[in-house]
């Protein structure tokens, strides 16, 4: 069965490489068409060439189409089975910089500003009109497509799309997949396919409820190493949260320092705030 995947924001080369690159090498996915859409022609071309290089490296054949600008969006959407969205409206400079600088001016310091707080709201207000446009056009040109969104703030965008667009919408984040491997790497623990874990929670703050290997609970060893070795330099906030609440969280210490800057001030807050 032919599958058409439309990537909205295909100038996001890292997401294109990781997501569509996985699709290219996955043996169950054959007869693929990638419709790559962006408003930046040069960045779109870069992603297009990168995907061709990946196909050549793995000896795969994938049909690829490029679409630039809103005028070509209907063609990109028509007949799509899946939509993948990874956009940043306005670019990093000046928009994202302002998400930090404006709140900071009034004493509200943020370290990531893509999830909640003033920066998260700013980003949502910029992004919602574009997401709504995608959703309304998807209703017309690919009404049965599944809309997979990687854009932040994922929670706010997902809530809006669920309420105001008639599309099958799913919000995703890569932090769940990488949380346990990164935790183990920071503690010098071996990670392989036998490690099993269960995670549940909200975006950018899901909780690692269980982690085991061959039926053996590994949480005691994780906590022992964390205490005895000291918290990894780049992950102090999450380790502090784990020892206070009993569970490790999926999103980075940079994110969590922003969520709870006062609760962690005494032990790791000052260091994290200056570092991040």
What are these regions (language model features)?
Residues 2-99, 112-113, 120-191, 203-208:
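Metallocofactor- and cofactor-centric catalytic cores in central/energy metabolism, strongly enriched
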Residues 102:
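Short, well-ordered surface patches within globular domains
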Residues 157, 275-276:
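Short amphipathic alpha-helical segments with coiled-coil-like heptad repeat character
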Residues 188-274:
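Long, compositionally biased stretches enriched for glycine and/or charged residues
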């Amino acid at each position: 069965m032919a599958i058409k995947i439309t990537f909205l924001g295909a100038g996001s080369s890292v997401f294109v490489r990781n997501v569509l690159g996985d699709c290219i090498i996955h043996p169950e996915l054959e007869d693929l068409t990638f419709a790559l859409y962006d408003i930046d022609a040069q960045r779109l071309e870069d992603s297009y060439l990168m995907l061709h290089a990946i196909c050549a490296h793995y000896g795969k054949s994938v049909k690829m189409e490029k679409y630039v600008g809103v005028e070509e969006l209907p063609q990109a959407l028509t007949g799509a089975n899946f939509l993948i969205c990874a956009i940043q409206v306005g670019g990093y400079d000046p928009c994202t910089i302002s998400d930090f600088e404006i709140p900071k001016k009034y004493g509200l310091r943020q370290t990531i500003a893509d999830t909640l707080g003033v920066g998260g709201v700013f980003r949502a207000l910029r992004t919602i009109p574009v997401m709504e446009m995608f959703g309304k056009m998807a209703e017309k040109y690919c009404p049965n497509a599944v809309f997979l969104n990687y854009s932040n703030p994922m929670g706010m965008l997902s809530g809006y799309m669920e309420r105001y667009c008639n599309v099958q919408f799913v919000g995703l984040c890569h932090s769940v997949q990488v949380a346990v491997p990164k935790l183990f790497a920071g503690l010098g623990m071996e990670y392989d396919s036998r490690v099993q874990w269960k995670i549940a929670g909200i975006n950018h703050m899901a909780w690692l409820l269980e982690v085991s290997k061959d039926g053996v609970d590994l949480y005691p060893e994780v906590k022992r190493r964390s205490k005895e070795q000291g918290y990894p330099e780049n992950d102090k906030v999450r380790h502090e949260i784990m020892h206070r609440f009993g569970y490790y969280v999926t999103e980075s210490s940079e994110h969590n320092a922003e969520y709870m800057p006062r609760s962690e001030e005494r032990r790791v807050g000052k260091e994290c705030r200056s570092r991040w």
